[in-house]
Amino acid sequence: MSYAQQMIQSNPSPARGGDALATCIEACFDCAQACTACADACLGEQDPKALARCIRLNLDCADLCDVTGRIVSRQTALEPRMVHAALQACATACKLCGDECEQHGQHGMEHCRVCAEACRRCEQACNALIGQFAA
């Protein structure tokens, strides 16, 4: 059992989303790490200037994934509209970053391929959970 699942189950406030919630929390934090590492790897490439858009999207996506993971981890006095907005923003960031990284991944940048995979997983996890929270 993951730490996210253990924390959800041990929280005295009932959680919305069940397994989808734990999956989303884990996907958000995994994606934040992948995006941060991908931005760093892009900076180490021969022509990092050519990767400016990718680096920017990586950093923005990492920030949104991190904050979304923290927001959806909190169950006490939950504000559904806040959670919904965070999930939407995170899914959008993951889509944009994943699309950009996928292009570079197809040209041999393995770090971008891995990051695109993490972005797709997080985007799917956010979209799977978003229905649990009213807009």
Question: Where in this protein do the model-derived segments appear?
Answer:
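Amphipathic alpha-helical hairpins
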Residues: M1-A135
